[in-house]
Amino acid sequence: MSALCDPPGAPGPPGPAPATHGPAPLSAQELSQEIKAFLTGVDPILGHQLSAREHARCGLLLLRSLPPARAAVLDHLRGVFDESVRAHLAALEESPVAGPPHLRPPPPSHVPTGGPGLEDVVHEVQQVLCEFIRANPKAWAPVISAWSIDLMGQLSSTYSGQHQRVPHATGSLNELLQLWMGCRATRTLMDIYVQCLSALIGSCPDACVDALLDTSVQHSPHFDWVVAHIGSSFPGTIISRVLSCGLKDFCVHSGAGGGASACGNSSQPPSTDPFPGSPAIPGEKRVPKIASVVGILGHLASRHGDSIRRELLRMFHDSLAGGSGGRNGEPSLQATVPFLLQLAVMSPALLGTVSGELVDCLKPPAVLSQLQQHLQGFPREELDNMLNLAVHLVSQASGTGAYRLLQFLVDTAMPASVITTQGLAVPDTVREACDRLIQLLLLHLQKLVHHRGGSPGEGVLGPPPPPRPVPFLDALRNHVGELCGETLRLERKRFLWQHQLLGLLSVYTRPSCGPEALGHLLSRARSPEELSLATQLYAGLVVSLSGLLPLAFRSCLARVHAGTLQPPFTARFLRNLALLVGWEQQGGEGPSALGARFGESASAHLADLAPLLLHPEEEVAEAAASLLAICPFPSEALSPSQLLGLVRAGVHHFFSSLRLHGPPGVASASQLLTRLSQTSPAGLKAVLQLLVEGALHRGNTELFGGEMDGDNETLSIVSTPLASASLLDINRRHTAAVPGPGGIWSVFHAGVIGRGLKPPKIVQSRNHQEVIYNTQSLVSLLVHCCSASGNSEREGCWGAPTLSPEAAKAVAVTLVESVCPDAAGAELAWPPEDHARATVERDLRIGRRFREQPLLFELLKLVAAAPPALCYCSVLLRGLLAALLSHWEASRHPDTTHSPWHLEASCILVAVMAEGSLLPPALGNMHEVFSQLAPFEVRLLLLSVWGFLREHGPLPQKFIFQSERGRFIRDFAREGGAEGGPHLSVLHSVLHRNIDRLGLFSGRFQAPPPSTLLRQGT
């Protein structure tokens, strides 16, 4: 009899139920009355109908006292729990506030949450069953766990969809959890099952888990909340069992092949979405079970993602280790790969859990070989379906694993190379499969990108739907730079795939990634072949993205000024832009449209490009100069600030390049400054002024053969302290001031009393040929800037350009301001000779400046070539002439060869005056005999020049414009000075005195007739 009372599978008779907290043991008569009352539902003593509460307690009493009544009592308790759940849902429906269960207010106080009088009964049931489990877990835990789990499944299925407060099973699993865990009856059943599983978890949990999974199969998906909650408490056990159960169900419903049904049945009508994220066919028997697995694992993924990932990867490796798949393999092993693919398709959470380690899992070549062998037995149709699933999964990959997955696929699909490391070779079949996978992926991404808005009919009656996200492309947003770098490697197939992917990414993320990708390509391309990738990308995006080039240009400039773009890439970016713009201007085979648009963008950002000419890295400054030298200027005039900024930066770059690279390195800067001088008169004046000032600056004088203006006097004075510094203070006070009218304190400052003369200056001069080359480069640039634009027909007989008098005047004024600023704006009229006594200091300073900077003579020659510009250098000519007169007067040598510099300066000075039409030809040729004369004779001739200029002052109003030649000339005959007068007589006297040596020169100093003067333009 006791055997009938034992639960199935019990090791031995459990004996009477424990009654530690229950009533005293019943007699046979009392037990008979309780049985009769339980069966009839009527009180045998009082004869009235038992209430639900009394009936339930009667059953609990029998459960304690009569083990054979276990099945009947447990079955009756199902109704008690069902009534309690119904009362709970009814109370929720009376609540006027809708919303999630955790946000709803508690039920009214007059209606108990567990039903009328059943809350205490539910609590007593829990106490009784828990006592049984604690007393004999091996006997009672399997029975009670099966009962409780089956009851929860029935309740979940029964009330799903019948009450508006119960969410649908296909909805949020969290809402179902919150609803049922808020019900006292279902929460009690859950606690009972958890206690059963806890009691057997260390010994034999299979009975409890099997009951859970059996119920899950029967009542899924309404039962998923139970499995999810229990899985959170026992993740290691539940996850493996759920996956195993799902795989078995998948094998049963998908047939022996394992993959055909998983990937779609060809007999079913085609779906608009080839890769559904959730089951779309309610009638398919397989879908509810695999959907339950997806829901359960998705709920557990947030906290137990590592356990799920390990279990999924274990299943994958076990399936590969089991041998080849196909029709001849074990069904569970051959269906594992399709099953895992289907799980990942239906659950983005599971895909994200695995994608992080998927690449590491597939990287060993042995794994790929095993996978290839495993799949080779599958039918072609199933392989195609699995390939389509794999394409969809890659397009849904997100996070950091997406880029790693892309790199893995591309590396695997690359053709074999002779430098492949031994042991890492990929089988050809695997390589071909990856090649096809990438091509299908690009095609699929193209469809997703260009059909993001949905079908044409969507949004007609309402707002348009939001664009569909593509997680794979979203994950690649932060890897545009890496993709561009890989593309520029120009490896076979790889750069074509990644270039196409860059185009899709640019369209998908517009307008952010398109300009960024174009900027990366332009800043990294090192050859025309690599640069063509940028032009091809632009050609593919120009239709889809408006304003692509301005955005790319602005973003790159922003990175340059922010310092995030390294100088080598900045220089390469600017050089590539210059190359594109040059292609457009030359009309060659290059992408002229791209070059023209980049030229427009560059012209709109001149203010941002100008500072790059001052970049500390020379290659960046030179690249910026190359771009600015050929990019078109805006159609409207440049603002004064923009113009001056460009001119200053261009002049600085000119001298910097001249110092570093010599004349060959200033081509771009010269072209830029020439173009700036042609923009407007203000631009011409600014270019000439800054060029002259820069050339005469102490930091650049040595480029043109000048002496470094070192303050050796100050250094020698400061080096040793003096006992008495009164005289030193006076000298400093006067010489440190701004140069003004001279005095006795500063004229002959040759040293310090008690310390001797000034130490001689240490002159470090450049190579003479280099100085000539540098000077010619500067003068050539000035000539190009001063040339009258559009007057090519007015060139001289030798093809020399006609210089603009206004431009030459600007050079002359700048010369005066640079050499002798205190005399700027002085009168142009030539003073008497006695006036030089008041300007001794200034004249000596001017003479010293000409000696230290030979470039001044070349600049005077340039000014003299455009009369009457030399008139504005009158103060310099006067000062230099006075200094030379002083020297020749003090010279005691028998000939002029002992003063080579003064001799050369005297010759150049007279020649320049003659070239500038300040002297008639007869007097202008006197410098030809200076080397044959004595110093006092040279002084006499220079005094005659002074006298002539005193009588015929160098005034611009004395010049007339000759339209035939397009220049100003001076008619000395009209002024009465064509024959030179008494000044020419001095020259003739000197010639007569040296007739034995200078007789052949007499013809050079005869005054020509007036008609000849006009014809010669002097």
From Swiss-Prot:
| Domain of life of the organism encoding this protein | Eukaryota
Q: What is its main location?
A: nucleus
- Bias (Pro residues) ranges: 8-17
Question: Might you report a single GO cellular component term?
Answer: cytoplasm
Record keywords, A-Z: Acetylation, Cytoplasm, Membrane, Nucleus, Phosphoprotein, Transmembrane, Transmembrane helix
The record's subcellular location field reads: Nucleus; Cytoplasm; Nucleus membrane
Q: How does it sit in the membrane?
A: Multi-pass membrane protein
List residues modified as N-acetylserine.
2
In-chain residues carrying the UniProt-annotated modification Phosphoserine:
278
Coiled coil feature spans: none
Question: Which regions span the lipid bilayer?
Answer: 533-553, 855-875, 929-949
Protein family (similarity comment) = Belongs to the Integrator subunit 5 family.
Q: How does it assemble?
A: Component of the Integrator complex, composed of core subunits INTS1, INTS2, INTS3, INTS4, INTS5, INTS6, INTS7, INTS8, INTS9/RC74, INTS10, INTS11/CPSF3L, INTS12, INTS13, INTS14 and INTS15. The core complex associates with protein phosphatase 2A subunits PPP2CA and PPP2R1A, to form the Integrator-PP2A (INTAC) complex.
Q: What is this protein called?
A: Integrator complex subunit 5
